[in-house]
Amino acid sequence: EAEPHSRI
């Protein structure tokens, strides 16, 4: 599953 927030 993809995370709801974007990781930088």
From Swiss-Prot:
GO terms for cellular component: extracellular region. The keyword Signal does not apply. It comes from the Eukaryota. One of its GO terms (molecular function) is serine-type endopeptidase inhibitor activity. Coiled coil: none annotated. Keywords: Lipid-binding, Metal-binding, Protease inhibitor, Secreted, Serine protease inhibitor. Plasma. Also expressed in skin (at protein level). Its main location: secreted. It is found in: Secreted. Serum albumin, the main protein of plasma, has a good binding capacity for water, Ca(2+), Na(+), K(+), fatty acids, hormones, bilirubin and drugs. Its main function is the regulation of the colloidal osmotic pressure of blood. Inhibits trypsin but has no inhibitory effect on thrombin, chymotrypsin, elastase and subtilisin. Belongs to the ALB/AFP/VDB family. This is Serum albumin. It comes from Duttaphrynus melanostictus.
